[in-house]
Amino acid sequence: MFWTWLDYRPGMNFDSICQVMNDIGMDGIMLNAPTPDDYRAAIPVAHKHGIEVYAWLWTMNLEHDRDKILKEHPEWFSVNRNGKSLADTTAYVGYYKFLCPALPEVREFIKEKIKAYCEVEGLNGIAIDYHRFVDVVLPTTLWPHYGIVQDREYAAWDYGYHPEMLRLFKEQHGYDPREQEDPSLDVKWRQFRC
């Protein structure tokens, strides 16, 4: 199998792209398109050229619906150990706007989003991406790019401290992980966030 990924934008010459993909022997594409309707437009074109299409969906980190959710539900965003929400701050890059998985509303939002894509006729599959928290430690090769050193887990990049997550953890384990000298070393807290 020979696959690639591609950002789809309405108006692009997707037919010629699929023709080139077919000519070089590509079998499929993980397509990142803004809406289910964009997939409905792209799939027949790709299939005409023998190309399978998987929807490439960002889940915990928002992409196409980021601004809308920031405006309507800022309380849905993940919070770092310093108490800062991604609704109000950034982690590394501006597009890192991860949601908090402890919130039932967030889980329902993601479920409905995936369901909408599952209903797209002809879609061959779905690839889920960014189904996690912000990177707590980046690869060492990226440290100079961001002007940071991450020789341990630092509070500014340690996410998963949304008040609802803290409440649920305390309910299960009887304490607030922030009471630890270094919460990143608390095995129960680490496992809880997995």
Question: Predicted segment positions?
Answer:
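Polysaccharide-binding and catalytic clefts of secreted carbohydrate-active enzymes
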Residues: 88-194
